[in-house]
Regions:
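Solvent-exposed interaction patches of small proteins and small membrane subunits
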Residues: 1-90
C-alpha cells in the first residue's frame, strides 16, 4: 500500500473509531433517534471515504501491475465485483 494513502486511511479510521464510540454512547444514553441517525449517516459517509482511499490504492498499484503482466481480465473482474457490491448497498 502506498504510504501516503495508508497514513490517510489509518487517520480516517481512527476518527471513525471515535465517531462509533460516540454513536454507541448516544444509544446507551437514549439520545433523540434523529440525532443518532444523523451520526450513523456521518459514520457511513466517513467509511465510504476510507473505501475510496483503498480503491484508489488498488487501482494505482495492484490493478496497474496486473495489466502490465497481461492480467487485465483479472483486474477488470475484481473492479467489477467491488462495483457490484457497492451498487447493492446503495
Amino acid at each position: 500500500m502506498k504510504e501516503a494513502i495508508k497514513k490517510k486511511a489509518i487517520r480516517r479510521l481512527q476518527i471513525l473509531e471515535g465517531q462509533i464510540r460516540g454513536l454507541q454512547k448516544m444509544v446507551q444514553e437514549e439520545k433523540y433517534c434523529i440525532d443518532i441517525l444523523h451520526q450513523s449517516l456521518a459514520v457511513k459517509e466517513a467509511l465510504s471515504g476510507v473505501e475510496n482511499l483503498i480503491l484508489e490504492n488498488h487501482l494505482e498499484t495492484h490493478a496497474v501491475e496486473q495489466m502490465k503482466k497481461g492480467q487485465s481480465i483479472k483486474a477488470v473482474r475484481e473492479i467489477l465485483s467491488i462495483y457490484k457490491l457497492s451498487r447493492k448497498r446503495s
